[in-house]
Structures are given as C-alpha cells and as structure tokens.
Amino acid sequence: MLKDKFNRTIKYLRISLTESCNLQCFYCRPNQDKTFTSCQSYLTPDEMLLITRVFSELGVSHVRLSGGEPLLKKDICLLVKEISRLSGINDVSLTTNGILLKKFAPSLKNAGLHRLNISLDSITPSKFKEITGGGDLKKVLQGIDASLKYGLTPIKLNMVVMRGINDDEIIPMIKFCLKKRLILRLLEFMPIGNSSSDVKERHMPAKEIREKVAQHFPLEKSTLRGPGPASYEYVKGDGLLIGFIHAVSQHFCKTCNRVRLLSSGKLHLCLGHEDQVDLAAVIRTPGVSIEDLKETIQAAVWSKPSVHRFNKS
C-alpha cells in the first residue's frame, strides 16, 4: 500500500501521455505558449507500462490517461489495452478534448477503456472557438455521439466555469447533458498557467456555481463517491448527476489520493507545487532493479505536500 506521511493512501495515477495538444485554450496555454518537452525526452510506451505496473504492485487501482491531448499519442489504444490488463488495475479512464473521439471511440472501447471525461467549456460554436483558439465544436459533438454509440460510458463532461466568459452557459450545458444523459462536472477556474489577476477576475467559487444551478434546477445530495474530488448532486426528477469541484475555495487535500506521471517521466506529487521526482532517470540507470524503482516511488509519495498553494496565487 502506497501512503504519504499524512496517512493518505495513493490509489490513483494520472499519466500525462504527451504535452502536445490540437487546441490552444487560453487558460491552459497562455500567451500562445507552444513550448513542449522534446519527443526524445518522452517516456517510451514500454517505460510507461513498467512504471504503471510498479504503481499497481504498490496498490494503485485507478489510472487516468491525459495530456496535452492523449489521442495525439501514437499507439494510444495499445497503451490502454496493456494498462487495462495489469493486475490490480480495475479502472482505466481517459480525459480528452473530444476533437479526435469520432475516429478513436470504437478502438478505445475494444482496447478496454472503461470511461471518458471530455473537456467542454461551451456549446456555442463561436465561444468554443474563442476559448480553444480555433477549435471546431462540431467535431467534439460528433465525438460524444460516437462514444455513446460504442458504449464508452459513463461519460463525464468537464466544464471549467469562468466568470464573464462562460458562466452564462452553465444552464444550457445542464440541458445538453440532460438530453444526452451525460454526467456534468463544474470546475472552479484554477491558477495554473495564469496570472493572479486573471484568476481573481475569472474565478467563480463552487458555492456560487451551485447557487446558480439551484435557481433553475432542484438539487439533492448524492451518496456517489468516485475516485476523484467531485461532490455530486442529483437534479430531482431527472436523475442527472452534477459534480462540483471546489479545488480553490474549499480544497480537498486531506483526501487527495493521486499523483501524476508526466510524459517526461517526472512524478508530480501535487498540481499546486513544483516538486517532482525523475522516474525516467531511475529506470534508465544501468543495473537498476524493480525494487529500486519501488523505493524511489515510495520515498517520493512520502514527501507529498499536505496542501496545495492555489489560495496563495
């Protein structure tokens, strides 16, 4: 079992397969930042599988594949297939912007992917294009339909709520999810890659987001508790699940159960800190053993920070 010094059990590994993305969302890549880790520095698929297997042997049971945009990763379906076969891994999910989903949905299903999260901040074509730096909403909608067709369910839509930008689309997004029978997760805008003034101006606390929802839809608490940080409520009468993620206004650090493996092979212990441990350097060292890798991971997790620093941004 993998524990840190605050007695939190780590069960969830998030793997960033690539830094590359086919969108340019202004809050994710500010100032048109297109600087990526060189391809030569990426973990190979075999290295990713090795590290993931060791995490599974240490007690991790949930793996989420993300990016950048993970569907840009060569052999993505093979990776899904191999990870889903690992002993101890009972949940393999993927977070995508949906642009390529129409193409990949059947292959992902056949590879053993359990479920999908799709990032979607607007269902208005012009606003979607503005937020994403030129993205085509139609492709995402086609990807959602293809995923439903091939049974990649449940599908969760992740909407980052930004005051003055897309907070007027919360209710239309709920209606869209009701129609498609999707789970909606409403996320607070987080200070990642943004100046503090941007965050202060755009941030809408989850409490305020919930109040806006409750003005239009009656809500009741759900007992659902997934591996992630969302607190869920039902829309009464319709059964739609809405998750509220309050990463800034009411952090969930005491129950944090995850770490992130970057495409470079560095283990990132907390999004709100810069601390990293280079696992690629470990596994590429001649003569290193699996036990050496396990000990490195255990020592890294033990040093995981108690809380993030978002509120100081």
Q: Model regions: which residues?
A:
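Auxiliary Fe-S-binding modules of radical SAM enzymes
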Residues: 1-12, 175, 179, 189-313
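Canonical Radical SAM [4Fe-4S] cluster-binding loop centered on the CxxxCxxC motif
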Residues: 6-44, 271
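Residue-level recognition of specific faces of alpha-helices
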Residues: 9, 14, 27, 51, ...
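A short, compositionally biased micro-patch
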Residues: 18-20, 111, 236, 262
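Glycine-centered loop/turn positions within well-structured domains
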Residues: 23, 125-126, 251, 277
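Residues that scaffold the ATP/ADP-binding catalytic core of kinase and kinase-like folds
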Residues: 24, 28, 73, 126, ...
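A short acidic, helix-capping loop that chelates divalent metal ions and anchors anionic groups
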Residues: 33-38, 124-131, 193-197, 278-280
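Radical SAM/AdoMet-radical enzyme domain recognition
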Residues: 42-65, 72-187
